[in-house]
Amino acid sequence: MKDLDVIGIGALNVDQFYRVERILEDGESVTRGSATYPGGSAANTVHGLSRLGAKTGFIGVVGGDAHGRLLTRAFKTAGVGISQVRAKPRARTGSVLCISDELGHRALYVTPGANSLLSADDIDPDYLKRAKILHLATFVDDRQFELSVALVQKLPRGVRLTFSPGSLYAARGMKSVAPILRHTFVLFINRQELERLTGQTLESGVRTFMKEGCRTVVVTLGAGMKIGRTDAVCYIRSGDREYIIEALPAETGRRTDTTGAGDAFAAGYLFGVLTGKSEDVCGRVGHLAALSAISKMGARQGLPTLAHLSNRYQRTYGQSL
């Protein structure tokens, strides 16, 4: 029985944010503020989907510490199922040191912690069968990468895989990631990751992913790039059709923090998939979700509710969502 829309699997981290005037290569600077928020790429996407009304769950590992309790409490508050989130009593919860400046640039330093303890014993095959979609994101260590590869080879029938490789898996190269791409229904990747993974330009790289087996490739373009006459924020290829999503201004007039923007985009896009929208509408919904997310510090603080997202979609595109 498919009683869950999306199950996420990936690292569970606490993001420790520091705002600075500018990121230095060497020197000393005063912080403008700091805060601690729940994070992790797949976790952010699943959290965002839950806020939009999707039925979600998560597979992952936290430590038996205050940060682990923070992460599970955040999931519970959002309505994400946590029956498959394992707490390892003697481990410390994973963390990411996030340094962002006033221009929206950022530097991330990852301590995997308890995430490195996730094993096949922590994954219940019967739980996976309950999902329409499994959304996979990254881990730091080789063991969890290999576990991810093995998992997608045995994915239950009827469960579609969506995949966000991020910079960590992009650095592993195409040969390593190909076994996952072969089973991918929707690939979420940004332009820099595409270029690093394939060594190719946008459209050539997308064609490579399609040849590897991806059904749909969604490339986010950060602050945007010109494609023809369009200021594009996203390029989508599905089968033999392509879609270009036009960039819109941020809600606050500037980017407060871009951490988690891609995760928010994936949440909006997948909401569109779950509700039967076309690829271009999915892309627009993803773009609006990302704009909302970057209006506040932290990957999840600005994630929209369905009411907020629907209202802005109506105002922007003159259509109901």
Task: List each model region and its residues.
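Ribokinase/PfkB-type carbohydrate-kinase core domain
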Residues: 1-12, 73-87, 100-248, 304-308, ...
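Conserved post-catalytic alpha-helical subdomain immediately downstream of the catalytic base
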Residues: 51, 221, 248-319
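Short pre-catalytic strand/loop immediately N-terminal to key active-site residues, enriched for Gly-Thr
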Residues: 29-39, 206, 244-260, 280
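Short, glycine/acidic-enriched loop or turn micro-motifs at the edges of active sites
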Residues: 14, 18, 64, 167, ...
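Glycine-rich phosphate/adenosyl-contacting loop at the front of the ribokinase-like
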Residues: 1-61, 66-73, 77, 254-255
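Short, glycine-/polar-rich solvent-exposed loops and beta-turns at beta-strand/coil boundaries
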Residues: 89-91
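Generic secondary-structure signature for well-ordered alpha-helical cores
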Residues: 14, 51, 80, 102, ...
